[in-house]
């Protein structure tokens, strides 16, 4: 049950909030009590609060007394309806001062003892409530009726015994020195006329407390101590509240005054307000479960719980928005954040157990750094990439490729001498870069020494793994490039071999069996040369590769290259046949060399026979290429090869064991028909040359007398031509040379005056040149006229 209104007297310095149930009749904790403390602002007061609890018989006026002392509003019994249980379980109210510098007060009203409604279970609840009140309170009020003093049950003797035993249990587990529980005995319906207050005090102290102390069994360390060593005891006599309300109010003020003078400035249990509910809940839960109530352990548990709560809240707040950090500002930002977080944490956690708060504080800083692991990796990613690129550059420089010349060079040397050390160099560079990264990462070690001393090293393994991956990727690019060059070397060796094959195909004595035996031997020799020259190179480029692997690879590549070359040959088969025919038909051997055939010296029969033989010999190539030969492939286990290996697919793909694809009959027929036409054209050309050689006489066969007659008859014409040529080609150049020589010499000797001598000479030379040119034209015209008249003269 909860009242809806807060109670405040205008003359009072405090505000009392409506009570809220802490534990119900079944001893179950009410979570609403925590919300009640939160909403009231109680969790912000720190240690500036006190706790007051009350114990006493049912219907003894406990709630009324608390209402009178603290201006509270606990529910009280309606006597007009008879005596019955009013307060069930444990209820709590909060008294807040209007002056925030004054301590607040938590007031607990517990269910009365000796309850008929509880029946046989009342003793269990009495023990629980007593232990709970003693564990929490700065002061425990024991409410007694004056008329019941001396009675065993009515005087709460059993309750007091429980209180002493429970307090002894608490003190025995508490390590704090001078730990005393304050007990306020409020004797109700007392009057000076009944008994002096001193007598009542002595009675309570001797007949109750000391008597109980002597009865109970105590730990050895308390055997020689009195009850006063554990309790601070005050006894108050309270007048009847109904018949003497003014005196009752006066007596209550005396109790309140004493409380104000005795209450500690801060909560004596050293539990801060924000952890009070958790502490209270754990204490009650431990009591209910009938476990040993260890107050230091409870405080440590509370400290651990609250510090963890503070840690979680601060950690979440600090990592909500983390900016993108570069390598240069990462450490500065992190140290600034650690200082801020540590200061914020200890501003709240310092109220709890120092050992626990420091331990959780270190956990906070460690977890905060852990939250920055992705940020750390991101900030250092650029440096890792830089190392990877640098390693690639160093390796590329170490194995510089120069293919501009006729021969491939790697690091200015033959590749076969350099490639064997490739993988070893890769490992050395990778190890060097990894060490370089480790040295660089050591600068990011966190050393923190403020309230707590703390060191943290970020996990460098992800960055190292990333570096290894990047470096391996960069190296694989270079490795693939060099493996490609190695493949080119294999292809080049095969192509060089095939030049010899093509020359062999032009041999006139070519036969099927001899050619394929020759090619088989040549192929084996080429494969052996590849193994001898390139095995160590391959093993250097592909780390831990076996000799058998390269033997298989080189065999596969050579077979593919052979098939490719034979395919190219078949694509150009017509041209090759024409070359064979041309060689056999148009050329003949002379002193060990091929020379063109002199067709004009050949007879028609010889030409026909030569054509027939050359054609047959040329087409022999088709018979050779209609056959092929197989190469026995050794067994090879592909499981021994890594799947990311450059040549994995090459080694895994099915390869034909045949050197070539045989020429089909249809293709051979088509090529034969096409070539026959061109053979015929070459034959006809030879016939033309032969016929021309027999019909046209050579100039060497003309008799010498013919040349003598020609000279005599044409002498006049020859003389005229020579005369013209002599004058035109000799005199004119001499005039030009004379003019320029005279002009140059005169200018050198006479300077500006030379012009008066040069000009007349120039004019004279020009006039002579004009006259000679005119004579040359007239002479040519005259010769042309004579020639024309000679042609028109009738024959006699």
From Swiss-Prot:
One cellular component term from this protein's GO annotations in UniProt: endoplasmic reticulum membrane
The protein's name: Protein SEY1 homolog
One example of a Gene Ontology biological process annotation: endoplasmic reticulum membrane fusion
Membrane-topology descriptor: Multi-pass membrane protein
Coiled-coil stretches noted in the UniProt entry, renumbered to this chain: 554-626
EC top class, as a word: hydrolase
InterPro entries the UniProt entry points to: G_GB1_RHD3_dom, P-loop_NTPase, RHD3/Sey1, Sey1/RHD3-like_3HB
Role according to the record: Probable GTP-binding protein that may be involved in cell development.
Keywords: Coiled coil, Endoplasmic reticulum, GTP-binding, Hydrolase, Membrane, Nucleotide-binding, Transmembrane, Transmembrane helix
Binding site for GTP: 56-63
EC number(s) given by UniProt: 3.6.5.-
Sequence ranges on the Lumenal membrane side: 723-725
């Amino acid at each position: 049950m909860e009242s809806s209104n807060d109670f405040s007297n205008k003359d009072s310095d405090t505000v009392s909030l409506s009570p809220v149930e802490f534990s119900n009749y079944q001893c179950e904790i009410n979570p609403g009590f925590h919300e009640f403390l939160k909403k009231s602002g109680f969790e912000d007061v720190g240690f500036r609060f006190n706790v007051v609890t009350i114990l006493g018989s049912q219907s003894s006026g406990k709630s009324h007394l608390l209402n009178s002392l603290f201006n509270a509003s606990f529910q009280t019994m309606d006597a007009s309806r008879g005596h019955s249980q009013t307060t069930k379980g444990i209820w709590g109210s909060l008294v807040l001062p209007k002056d925030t510098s004054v301590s607040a007060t938590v007031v607990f009203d517990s269910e009365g003892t000796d309850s008929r409604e509880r029946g046989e279970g009342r003793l269990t609840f009495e023990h629980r409530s007593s232990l709970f009140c003693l564990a929490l309170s700065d002061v425990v009020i024991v409410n007694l009726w004056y008329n019941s003093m001396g009675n065993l049950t009515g005087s709460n003797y059993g309750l007091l015994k429980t209180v002493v035993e429970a307090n002894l249990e608490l003190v025995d587990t508490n390590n704090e020195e001078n730990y005393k529980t304050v007990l306020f005995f409020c004797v109700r319906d007392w009057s000076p006329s009944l008994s002096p207050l001193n007598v009542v005090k002595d009675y309570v102290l001797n007949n109750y407390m000391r008597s109980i102390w002597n009865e109970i069994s105590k730990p050895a360390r308390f055997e020689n101590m009195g009850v006063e060593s554990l309790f601070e005891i005050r006894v108050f006599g309270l007048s009847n509240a109904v018949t003497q309300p003014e005196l009752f109010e006066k007596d209550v003020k005396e109790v309140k005054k004493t409380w104000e003078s005795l209450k500690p400035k801060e909560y004596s249990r050293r539990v801060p307000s924000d952890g009070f509910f958790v502490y209270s809940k754990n204490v009650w839960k431990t009591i209910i479960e009938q476990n040993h109530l260890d107050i230091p352990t409870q405080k440590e548990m509370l400290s651990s719980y609250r510090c963890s709560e503070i840690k979680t809240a601060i950690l979440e707040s600090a990592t909500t928005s983390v900016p993108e950090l570069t390598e240069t500002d990462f450490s500065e930002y992190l140290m600034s954040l650690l200082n801020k977080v540590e200061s914020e944490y200890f501003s709240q956690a310092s109220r709890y157990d120092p050992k626990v708060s420091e331990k959780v504080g270190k956990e906070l800083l460690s977890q905060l750094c852990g939250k920055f692991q992705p940020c750390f990796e991101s900030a250092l990613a650029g440096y890792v990439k830089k190392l990877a690129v640098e390693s690639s550059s160093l390796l590329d420089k170490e194995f510089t490729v120069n293919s501009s010349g006729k021969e491939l060079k790697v690091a200015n040397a033959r590749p076969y001498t350099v490639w064997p050390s490739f993988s070893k160099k890769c490992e050395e560079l990778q190890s060097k870069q990894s060490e370089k990264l480790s040295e660089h990462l050591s600068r990011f070690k966190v050393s923190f020494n403020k309230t707590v001393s703390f060191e943290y090293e970020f996990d460098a393994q992800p960055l190292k793994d990333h570096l290894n991956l990047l470096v391996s990727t960069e190296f694989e690019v270079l490795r693939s490039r060099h493996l490609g060059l190695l493949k080119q070397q294999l292809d080049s060796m095969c192509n060089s071999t095939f030049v010899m094959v093509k020359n062999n195909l032009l041999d006139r004595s070519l036969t099927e069996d001899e050619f394929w035996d020759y090619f088989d031997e040549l192929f084996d020799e080429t494969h052996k040369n590849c193994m001898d020259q390139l095995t160590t190179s391959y093993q250097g480029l592909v780390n831990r590769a076996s000799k058998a692997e390269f033997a298989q690879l080189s065999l596969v590549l050579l077979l593919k290259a052979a098939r490719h070359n034979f395919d190219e040959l078949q694509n150009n088969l017509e041209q090759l046949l024409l070359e064979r025919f041309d060689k056999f038909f148009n050329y003949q051997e002379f002193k060990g060399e091929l020379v063109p055939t002199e067709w004009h010296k050949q007879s028609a029969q010889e030409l026909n026979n030569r054509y027939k033989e050359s054609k047959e010999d040329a087409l022999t190539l088709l018979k050779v290429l209609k056959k092929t030969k197989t190469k026995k492939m050794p067994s090879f286990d592909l499981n021994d090869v890594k799947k990311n290996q450059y040549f994995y697919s090459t080694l895994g793909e099915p390869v034909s064991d045949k050197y070539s694809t045989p020429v089909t009959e249809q293709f051979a027929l088509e090529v034969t028909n096409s070539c026959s036409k061109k053979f015929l054209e070459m034959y006809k050309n030879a016939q033309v040359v032969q016929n021309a050689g027999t019909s046209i006489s050579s100039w060497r066969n003309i008799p010498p007398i013919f040349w003598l007659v020609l000279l005599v008859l044409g002498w006049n014409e020859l003389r005229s031509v020579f005369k013209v040529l002599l004058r035109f080609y000799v005199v004119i150049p001499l005039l030009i040379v004379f003019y320029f020589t005279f002009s140059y010499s005169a200018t050198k000797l006479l300077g500006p005056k030379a012009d008066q001598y040069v000009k007349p000479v120039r004019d004279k030379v020009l006039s002579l040149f004009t006259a000679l040119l005119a004579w040359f034209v007239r002479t040519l015209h005259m010769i042309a006229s004579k020639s024309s008249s000679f042609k028109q003269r009738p024959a006699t």
